[in-house]
Amino acid sequence: MAKEAGRIRRRERKNIASGIAHVNSSFNNTTITITDAQGNAIAWSSAGTMGFKGSRKSTPYAAQVAAEDVAKKAQEHGMRTLEVEVAGPGSGRESALRALQASGFTVTSIRDVTTIPHNGCRPRKRRRV
């Protein structure tokens, strides 16, 4: 017997006024997740999901496009104010932050939460170009 096709259920609109934007910018990609105060994800996007492939994902423009996309998704849930947590060494940090501010959010605080090892794991070998 064939299984019944599952219905695609649209997530219900939450009415959340403020949240936290987690901007994770690595050397290869930039991901932006907007959560509520408890840490439940409301909207997310990345340079890869916006159609950028390969080395184009790590550009500031790709991070800006991803930030504009996630801002539009979060504003559908009624979000107006954001705290921004920026992590990682990538080039998309500042452009993602500027795009979030330009899309109409009131940014209350900006924190750098990049993890710094206290001489933990051995780093990978140096690149010779």
Curated annotation (Swiss-Prot):
Keywords: Ribonucleoprotein, Ribosomal protein, RNA-binding, rRNA-binding. InterPro entries: Ribosomal_uS11, Ribosomal_uS11_bac-type, Ribosomal_uS11_sf. One of its GO terms (molecular function) is rRNA binding. One of its GO terms (biological process) is translation. Belongs to the universal ribosomal protein uS11 family. Part of the 30S ribosomal subunit. Interacts with proteins S7 and S18. Binds to IF-3. NCBIfam families: PRK05309.1, uS11_bact. This is Small ribosomal subunit protein uS11.
